[in-house]
Amino acid sequence: MGSNSSPPTVLQLCYENVTGSCVKTPYSPGSRVILYAVFGFGAVLAVFGNLMVMISILHFKQLHSPTNFLIASLACADFGVGISVMPFSMVRSIESCWYFGRSFCTFHTCCDVAFCYSSLFHLSFISIDRYIAVTDPLVYPTKFTVSVSGICIGVSWILPLVYSGAVFYTGVYDDGLEELSSALNCVGGCQVVVNQNWVLIDFLSFLIPTLVMIILYGNIFLVARQQAKKIENIGSKTESSSESYKARVARRERKAAKTLGITVVAFMISWLPYSIDSLVDAFMGFITPAYIYEICVWCAYYNSAMNPLIYALFYPWFKKAIKVIMSGQVFKNSSATMNLFSEQI
């Protein structure tokens, strides 16, 4: 008599014949190809897009300004995500296994957190920079100098690196969750379980600077509207050369603030789902399905690839710089002093 029972499902492991190996839950071949293409494209764009930003700002002397140095340093953080975080997370997300060892798992997690906070710090300082530039454009050059920008860059790197290293290399992040962490700590896994205290600290560390940036940019656009009305009034009268100069400077700073404001909004939208999900998981017993978690993670990662696209859309100088770099003209001795702006202010 034939049996109607189906054959037992073969359990796939990350490491066959290894005791304590994690269970592998692979996608179908078609899905894997699509996911590798999508995630790989994000990583490539993050690496090469941000590399273009760094080369443009550091090579062309016309772009050597306090704001642009902050943008170049922000691009460096996003470049770090693209080259040291996204490729390995891509394999982990698609294969559902970590094949790079326990030590590199810790290093990878540190880089992930450090680059995220570095981006947040850079954007916070850029918001302050834009606030001063728009509210007081003529005094701004004496307030936000290259030296001040250098200090901001130093803080934006040192604090996140020290914080992430101290948290993940000392093991304080899973205090009170040792049993759960041990249960998830199978061979081929890189699952970091963070306790409620550190998740709350992380969430507040994201929320407070975000609220400050929202307030600053809200004030920036209120001031910008007032300045626009003044410029209209000046335009309807006989304007002096001094008033004309002030109007052009104010217009330039508002345009820069708008572009960088879009960058800040993109960061908030990208990272907010992950921040909320982490908070909910910590206080609700890690209830988020794996696929929801992966979507939140990759929305955050993709932010590192978005900034160069934003600059390309709103900064004519960046598009011109890319053409010079890609055409090989950048290797000419005179390229560093090339004019990238269509109009001078």
Swiss-Prot record:
Membrane topology: Multi-pass membrane protein
Residue intervals annotated with topology Cytoplasmic: 54-68, 129-147, 224-259, 303-345
A GO CC term attached to the entry: plasma membrane
Regions that span the bilayer: 33-53, 69-89, 108-128, 148-168, 203-223, 260-276, 283-302
Sequence segments annotated as region (Extracellular Loop 2 (ECL2)): 174-187
Alphabetized SUPFAM superfamilies for the sequence: Family A G protein-coupled receptor-like (SSF81321)
Superkingdom: Eukaryota
Effects seen without this gene: Mice lacking Taar2, Taar3, Taar4, Taar5, Taar6, Taar7a, Taar7b, Taar7d, Taar7e, Taar7f, Taar8a, Taar8b, Taar8c and Taar9 show no visible phenotype or behavioral deficits. They however show an absence of aversion to low concentrations of amines such as 2-phenylethylamine, isopentylamine, N-methylpiperidine and cadaverine.
Pfam families in alphabetical order: 7tm_1 (PF00001)
Cellular compartments annotated: Cell membrane
Disulfide topology: 22-186, 105-190
Keyword terms: Cell membrane, Disulfide bond, G-protein coupled receptor, Glycoprotein, Membrane, Receptor, Transducer, Transmembrane, Transmembrane helix
GO molecular function annotations of the record: trace-amine receptor activity
Glycosylation sites: 17
Main location per the UniProt record: membrane
Tissue specificity comment: Specifically expressed in neurons of the olfactory epithelium, to discrete glomeruli predominantly localized to a confined bulb region. Present in a ventral area of the main olfactory epithelium.
Gene3D superfamilies cross-referenced by the UniProt entry: Rhodopsin 7-helix transmembrane proteins
CDD domains (alphabetical): 7tmA_TAAR6_8_9 (cd15316)
Record text about domains: In addition to the well known disulfide bond common to G-protein coupled receptor 1 family, trace amine-associated receptors (TAARs) contain an unique disulfide bond (Cys-22-Cys-186) connecting the N-terminus to the extracellular Loop 2 (ECL2), which is required for agonist-induced receptor activation.
Family (UniProt): Belongs to the G-protein coupled receptor 1 family.
Protein name: Trace amine-associated receptor 6
Organism classification: Eukaryota, Metazoa, Chordata, Craniata, Vertebrata
Name of the gene this protein is made from: Taar6
